[in-house]
């Protein structure tokens, strides 16, 4: 499959779904009132998606990989923040597990894409 747009990247698609899930959780009444955690987890989820898109416009694969690493770290941040939401009883164990696993799938896809770029993709050249 040829990647012509950032939307074609599987990791971006998974990050978009992660962001959708996080925004859904943060609309819950108790969660929505914890502005600090709500903003932090929304920012982290969005960052996973946005860094993939931003990195897509990089001039070189090493630069793209740097943005993908940021995206991967943001997924881990979401996972950590989900524990706070669970501990504060803002979300159920089922919601925690579902969203945690979405973050894990996204993180794995990003990691796989990083490895692909390192091993197989030719270096991008400046147009």
Stretch-by-stretch model annotation:
Residues 1-127:
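Short, C-terminally biased terminal segments at protein or domain edges
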């Amino acid at each position: 499959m040829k990647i012509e747009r950032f939307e074609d990247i599987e990791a971006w698609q998974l990050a978009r779904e992660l962001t959708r899930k996080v925004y859904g959780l943060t609309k819950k009444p108790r969660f929505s009132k914890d502005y600090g955690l709500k903003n932090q987890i929304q920012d982290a989820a969005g960052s996973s998606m946005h860094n993939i898109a931003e990195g897509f416009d990089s001039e070189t694969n090493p630069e793209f990989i740097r943005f993908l690493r940021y995206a991967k770290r943001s997924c881990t941040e979401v996972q950590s923040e989900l524990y706070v939401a669970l501990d504060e009883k803002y979300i159920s164990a089922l919601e925690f597990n579902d969203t945690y696993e979405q973050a894990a799938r996204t993180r794995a896809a990003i990691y796989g894409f990083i490895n692909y770029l390192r091993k197989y993709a030719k270096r991008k050249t400046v147009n």
